Amino acid sequence: MKTFAYRLHFQIRKRLSGKHKLVLYSNRFNACFISQKLRDKVPTNHIMFKNTMRSYSYIFFALFGIALLLPYTVVAGTQAKAKVAIFYTVTTPQLKSDVERALRDELSSNIELITCEEASIFKEIVAEGYVGQKPAAKYAAIYLEQVESGADVVLSVCSSVADIAYAMRDISAFMGVPLIDINEEMCREAVRKGCKITVVATFPSAIGPIGRTLERKSREMGKHIEVRSVLVNGGFGLDKETFKSLMAKELKKPAESSDVIIFAQSSMAYCANYIKELYGKEVLSNPKFGAKAVRAALLNKGLIK
């Protein structure tokens, strides 16, 4: 302590340039600097400066702790955001808004959203009536492009390509970039909540893949389910109020005998609460379930906390 005090005394005297004459006051307990005049009045064995030195110690250790934590604070503040690629094969402004809002609500500002779209995939599936080699190859190529561009997770939004996403699960696991079907967790939740499940879609190409996903989930959970479908022809692209009226009309009778109603397309999500309140049935839409699946994938990779 005395050695430290003498050094400090030297530095203080040097900085003050002789303006104030300071002398070292010390005993076996304490050491500090006082004026020459005050030093002459204080007994040598006095320990009145104990609290002063204790305060110096607290300040020293506080500054030392800040110095230790500062590098980690800087690293945390500059950590790169996780990149989430959203893969569309068909879009509307409402669809994009619902999907992106669900992701940001679930993940806050911890992500960077990358949008990719290939409309020809959906058009070819609709034209052929099934997922042929050409649209499947395009889908796989776009996934690999997102991997090369640095995406951490790829969220597949279109229900019509759900079978391709399922077929590519081993490839995505090998790549270390999860390919998430936006319907997967929604279908799991539907099986949890009931046995009589009604699938609603505006395109027939979305119904088959959703039905197969429900069947897989029911097998995994050891549960028998009954799946029915409702095709709302001409519903895609309508304004909100017109679409809600059409949905209410088409679902009036099926809702009576359903435990759960699921919307096969993300573009229908805004109508979920309306139908739920109208018929008192559990209604599930996929954006929020897709967002939860993305969060789980990023947690598994250690990219978010």
Where are these regions (language model features)?
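Non-catalytic structural scaffold of enzyme domains
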Residues: 77-305
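Bacterial N-terminal signal peptides that target proteins for export
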Residues: 49-60
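Serine residues within intrinsically disordered or low-complexity segments
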Residues: 17, 26, 35, 55-57
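Polybasic, lysine-rich low-complexity intrinsically disordered segments
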Residues: 2-3, 12-14, 19, 37, ...
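Bacterial Sec-dependent signal peptides at the C-terminal "C-region" and cleavage site
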Residues: 69-79
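Bacterial N-terminal signal peptides
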Residues: 60-71
